[in-house]
Amino acid sequence: MSKPIVMERGVKYRDADKMALIPVKNVAIEREALLRKPEWMKIKLPADSTRIQGIKAAMRKNGLHSVCEEASCPNLAECFNHGTATFMILGAICTRRCPFCDVAHGRPVAPDANEPVKLAQTIADMALRYVVITSVDRDDLRDGGAQHFADCITAIREKSPQIKIETLVPDFRGRMDRALDILTATPPDVFNHNLENVPRIYRQVRPGADYNWSLKLLERFKEAHPEIPTKSGLMVGLGETNEEIIEVMRDLRRHGVTMLTLGQYLQPSRHHLPVQRYVSPDEFDEMKAEALAMGFTHAACGPFVRSSYHADLQAKGMEVK
């Protein structure tokens, strides 16, 4: 077990330092050999990285963050090369320390009051028609960051009136009433909150989160705005069974969720939870068929699918896998 550390405000803690603070068994110790990636998990990198570097430069110029970079998303090259990115607001330091996630943990600094304006200008400069806004968890804020989400939505729409906005929000633990009062007053076009995995291994995968709380968050937003699609996603390959995934899908439908994403979990480093299995493309196709039969209007299911992967196409109901 790594030696516990004293966190300094504004410092990013990753890998061994981050995992040392997790109140579960350190999965990086004494585990079996890593699974070999199957052929279908091989990523093709674009030959020209000009567009990728351009997006990174725009982010740096305005002091913005993308979850694509901060979470080491395997689709970064593809998405950046197509001129799309998922913006991460409220800084790049998360107050949670989930052992599947590569976003840094620590004591974050105060939110940047100018971030909504800078974000809106960057999006306008990039001439985006669909944008996904997500954030780190901010358990240090009284509203969990909900007002900052609302401020970003307002600023973006002022600069780009025709744009579609999807928000991928945290669970607002202990702050649901306050957060929903704010978010339902300034709603996005798609409201997304990920369950991430199945109840049986929730404490291991999402320490500090609660499965039923997340379902209730999705349900209550839908009750306030029945006309707005609600969306959720899971990572698979962490030890769950296909039957458990299907049961989570049923729970989501019972709570009014209409859009679903399922993708393969990939281990960011040796300090994170190991991959227990690789789910085949055929299995993903079967789960998509199950989802559509349950009444999901959209289901993006495939090895490289992530919540915001081609989110504009997902929202249009186009095939994403």
UniProtKB/Swiss-Prot annotation:
Q: What's one Pfam family here?
A: LIAS_N
Give the note describing cofactor binding and stoichiometry.
Answer: Binds 2 [4Fe-4S] clusters per subunit. One cluster is coordinated with 3 cysteines and an exchangeable S-adenosyl-L-methionine.
Keyword Metal-binding part of the UniProt annotation: yes
Alphabetical list of InterPro entries matching this protein: Aldolase_TIM, Elp3/MiaA/NifB-like_rSAM, LIAS_N, Lipoyl_synth, rSAM
The record ties this protein, via SMART domains, to: Elp3
What catalytic activity is recorded?
Answer: [[Fe-S] cluster scaffold protein carrying a second [4Fe-4S](2+) cluster] + N(6)-octanoyl-L-lysyl-[protein] + 2 oxidized [2Fe-2S]-[ferredoxin] + 2 S-adenosyl-L-methionine + 4 H(+) = [[Fe-S] cluster scaffold protein] + N(6)-[(R)-dihydrolipoyl]-L-lysyl-[protein] + 4 Fe(3+) + 2 hydrogen sulfide + 2 5'-deoxyadenosine + 2 L-methionine + 2 reduced [2Fe-2S]-[ferredoxin]
Q: Which family does it belong to?
A: Belongs to the radical SAM superfamily. Lipoyl synthase family.
User: What is the protein name given in its UniProt record?
Assistant: Lipoyl synthase
